[in-house]
Amino acid sequence: MAEPTATREQAQQRMAQLRGEISEHDYHYYVLDRPTISDAEYDALFRELQRLEAAYPDLVSSDSPTQRVAGTAQEGFEAVVHDTPMLSLDNAFEADDLVDFDRRIRDRLGVASVVYTGEPKLDGISLSLTYQDGELVRAGTRGDGHTGEDVTANVRTLRSVPLRLRGDGYPGRLEVRGEVVIRKEDFERLNQARLDAGERPFANPRNAAAGSLRQLDPRITARRPLTLFTFGVGDPLALGVESHWQVLECLAGWGFRTTAPLEHLEGVSACQAYRDRLIEERDALPFEIDGAVFKVDDLAVREQLGFTARAPRWALAFKLPAREATTVVEAIVPSVGRTGKITPLARLQPVEVSGVTVARASLHNADELARMDVREGDTVMVRRAGDVIPQITDVVLAKRPEGAQPWRFEERVQACPECGSAVQRIEGEAAHRCVGGLYCPAQREGAILHFASRRALDIDGLGEKIVEQLVAKGLVVDLADLFRLGHAQLAGLERMGDKSADNLLAALDRARSTTLARFLYALGIPHVGEVTARRLAEAAYGLMVAVPRGDRAALRAAAGLDAQTAITSEALLRVMAAPADDLEAIEDVGPVVARAIAGFFAEPHNRQVVDHLCAAGVHWPEPDPPEQAESVSSLAGRAFVVTGTLETMTRDEAKAAIEACGGRVTGSVSRKTDYLVAGADAGSKLNKARELGVEVVNESGLRELLAGAGA
């Protein structure tokens, strides 16, 4: 709600100010890549504008940053007719094509040389944006060049598209042309998220951009990392400028991104050199390109040259070498990454793709392999983009050899191919993982770096380059070998002298003394971060309660350890021996995390490395067992969730009061929740609590519970 003292006029002024500030910050972040404020500061401005608009809904303007995303899905896309046709460009594939293009223009004009602009041809989706008096009123896809689809609601969600133009000097009606793309790094993150969620990845950034732009629900488009780069306008002469270069300068001044690298080029030789540079720099560009575009820069000269039936005479698209090629799958093999993820890889008959020889391609995971049904001997389409491992995008079924058999991951990969440890697929994950994280050679460097990290054992001076050498020379095979390193071994490494070796040995010696929480975190158990490791250490004596205190022999047996083990910490033994059901009862440990912990310690190789670490002198003060109090609080061990807005205390204060009485506060409602404390605007957690039959109390009810527990 707006401040009660704010008048309508004050609110209107503040809303206009906030719209301007937020739009300015969007421009710096999404167009210039130069953020001017922190995310928290931006969010505060955005929330303030939302509150004011909620208080004065009749003052909400269509160009407000809060109005980018429509709240409902569309039933379909209306047809939209372009003010000026969006014609194709003639294509060139050979150097002679470019020479002929330049010669035809010079002959037609009767001049010795022509000035062109050179720009990358982005591999995305072409759009036409129409602005009326500076405000975005329509966005359409290219379609057949004359008629496209109205995607205005979706395009409004793109932060690189100004809802209102910046500056001044624009005509009353302006049609802007551009290309919507997904940058390479955003595409990799998007596909990884889809794979992690068990969804089919996009074949390439162009397909991802096209699919994202044509969503019927703009809220889905808003979650996709789309960016617009502009390359011109429908009617450049309406801007009152003389060159294409000046058109692009106008667009940049009005708040748009333009493509880069953009160059002025005089003559065909300069164009050829620009094309060659683009080929060399292609992998370093943040977006995919499929060519270079050359346009006559002088707008008056363009008018003289005119158009053919399908394309302008003054522009040419020079295609770059293809990113895809056809080859044969010689074998499918599992590959173990640094985090233990096991990925099926296709070994290919070597094939050249855009100037690079490709001999392998990722098949992502078991589900994706089964969906694509790639088989050994198949002919496949392979795509390469930048430094990313090439991807198989399609199988040519017509060329499948007779007798080719499906490659079933679970049948072929029953143990880690690197170390023989068990393979685990945790519910909700798409990936299979080797559970021998402390033992597996493929994971060794990553395991050591995590073990030595600041929040783990904090071994100062043990960086990536040193770890690479230690592993390559065979000096560290398991983590305990770190504590057996000598001065001569360390001093002989690159970038290490006598003093550095002494410092690292001292850091290793200090690291022997730690805490159980840090030690558990340092082991790199999947899904176990600092908070979960601390919860495990604190709750250790509440695990394996059927085993009496002090009975380490029974705990060793339950944990799969023999009597000679160097592990003497009862708290650690209880964690190692605990079944998933016990672990799941710990705060912040759900079923997925519980199974990951139990699976980690069930792997004999991991237990062996933990044993070796304790034998090497890694130790910690034993956590104090919980005292058996004469009178136990009625809230001891009870699980609470606090949601909504409380009137007489903050949620942090409520949490502190509950924990002081022995209760615990979690962030989500489950069948293990005893009480939901519901304040105002409780929302979905209240609904879930009711569905599960969890007892719901208001703030007054919480105070009664606390009073009854002696608070």
From Swiss-Prot:
Family per similarity comment: Belongs to the NAD-dependent DNA ligase family. LigA subfamily.
Keyword terms: DNA damage, DNA repair, DNA replication, Ligase, Magnesium, Manganese, Metal-binding, NAD, Zinc
SMART domains per record: BRCT, HhH1, LIGANc
A Pfam entry, by short name: Nlig-Ia
EC number(s) per entry: 6.5.1.2
Primary role: DNA ligase that catalyzes the formation of phosphodiester linkages between 5'-phosphoryl and 3'-hydroxyl groups in double-stranded DNA using NAD as a coenzyme and as the energy source for the reaction. It is essential for DNA replication and repair of damaged DNA.
Signal peptide: none
Active site: K121
Any one Gene Ontology molecular-function term assigned to this protein's record: DNA binding
Catalytic activity: NAD(+) + (deoxyribonucleotide)n-3'-hydroxyl + 5'-phospho-(deoxyribonucleotide)m = (deoxyribonucleotide)n+m + AMP + beta-nicotinamide D-nucleotide
Necessary cofactors: Mg(2+); Mn(2+)
Residue ranges of domain BRCT in the record: 630-711
Name this polypeptide is given: DNA ligase
Record: residues binding NAD(+): D39, A40, E41, Y42, D43, S88, L89, E119, R142, E179, K295, K319
GO cellular component annotations of the record: cytosol
PROSITE patterns given in the database record: BRCT, DNA_LIGASE_N1, DNA_LIGASE_N2
Amino-acid positions noted as binding Zn(2+) in the UniProt annotation, renumbered to this chain: C416, C419, C434, C440
